[in-house]
């Protein structure tokens, strides 16, 4: 008996699914856009006209008004409110009393020079002070620059020399013992290099803010003279007495 050749664990069987090695094209791997319908239509083909369907429209006989929800005044028309004339009663307006001049503020006897022709008259007054003061500068108001010395203006100055005393620094009379003493140096405060002690300031007493104006007292008011809420008592005014010997000025004469 010849020995059987070992063929391994694989045995011929029916495949459970498609084997991609058996296909030369990708096959159903790619989804081609459809040529029917409207959604996802292929862009390489013309698309046929499509129609949309919807429900039946609403009935026209249906009432779309809010109904008796709003209470409309029956007196309101398209031209406005239909009412009769109405009047309102208010208080009398308070008219401001103007301070007009009275008869005593006029002097008609002084108006003759404005109404009738008068002779020319001249007025004599004191001499004005503006002509006495001469506003032009005098000879003493000018200060001419000097023409001598090194500080000449507009001129060429000659060389000048200054003479001063001889310095004792480095000379035979220089006193070498004059060195600065302890009092020649300024003493530095201790608080600059050491801890500074606490300091307190004493100020004046602070008064609280208040109103210090003068207020009227009880004697400054006169309630008996107030007639805002009560009728005013009758008052009589007196005028001036006109003279019987002076003819009044009559302007409007026709």
Curated annotation (Swiss-Prot):
GO biological process, one term: cell differentiation
Residue segments, region Disordered: 207-228
Superkingdom per UniProt: Eukaryota
Keywords annotated in UniProt: Cell projection, Cilium, Cytoplasm, Cytoskeleton, Developmental protein, Differentiation, Flagellum, Repeat, Spermatogenesis
Pfam families noted in UniProt: SHIPPO-rpt
Main localization, broad class: cytoplasm
UniProt subcellular location: Cytoplasm; Cytoplasm, Cytoskeleton, Flagellum axoneme
GO cellular component: cytoplasm; outer dense fiber; sperm flagellum
STPGR repeats: 180-205, 216-241
Tissue: Testis-specific (at protein level). Expression restricted to the germ cell fraction, absent in somatic cell fractions such as Sertoli and Leydig cells. Expression detected in the third week postpartum (23 days) after haploid germ cells developed, expression increased with age. Expressed in the tails of elongated spermatids sticking out toward the tubular lumen, and in cytoplasmic droplets still attached to the spermatid tail membrane. Expressed in the tails of mature sperm, from the connecting piece proximal to the head, along the middle and principal pieces, down to the distal end piece.
Function: Outer dense fibers are filamentous structures located on the outside of the axoneme in the midpiece and principal piece of the mammalian sperm tail. May help to maintain the passive elastic structures and elastic recoil of the sperm tail.
Note: 'Shippo' is a Japanese word for tail.
Full protein name: Ciliary microtubule associated protein 1A
Lineage of origin: Eukaryota, Metazoa, Chordata, Craniata, Vertebrata
């Amino acid at each position: 008996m010849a020995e059987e050749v070992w063929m391994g664990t694989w045995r011929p069987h029916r495949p459970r699914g498609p084997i991609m090695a058996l296909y030369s094209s990708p096959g159903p791997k790619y989804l081609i856009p459809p040529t029917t319908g409207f959604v996802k239509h292929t862009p390489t083909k013309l698309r046929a006209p499509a129609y949309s369907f919807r429900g039946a429209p609403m009935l026209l006989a249906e009432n779309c008004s809010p109904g008796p929800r709003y209470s409309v005044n029956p007196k309101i028309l398209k031209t406005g409110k239909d009412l009769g004339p109405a009047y309102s009663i208010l208080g009398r307006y308070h008219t401001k009393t103007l301070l007009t001049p009275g008869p005593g503020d006029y002097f008609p006897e002084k108006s003759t020079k404005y109404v009738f022709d008068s002779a020319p008259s001249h007025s004599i007054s004191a001499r004005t002070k503006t002509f006495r003061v001469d506003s032009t500068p005098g000879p003493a108001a000018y200060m001419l620059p000097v023409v001598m010395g090194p500080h000449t203006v507009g001129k060429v100055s000659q060389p000048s020399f200054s003479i001063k005393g001889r310095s004792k620094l480095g000379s035979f009379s220089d006193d070498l013992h004059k060195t600065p003493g302890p009092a020649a140096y300024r003493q530095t405060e201790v608080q600059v290099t050491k801890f500074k002690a606490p300091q307190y300031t004493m100020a004046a007493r602070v008064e609280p803010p208040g109103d210090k104006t003068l207020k009227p007292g009880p004697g400054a008011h006169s309630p008996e003279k107030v007639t805002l809420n009560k009728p005013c008592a009758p008052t009589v005014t007196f005028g001036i007495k006109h003279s019987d010997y002076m003819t009044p000025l009559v302007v409007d004469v026709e």
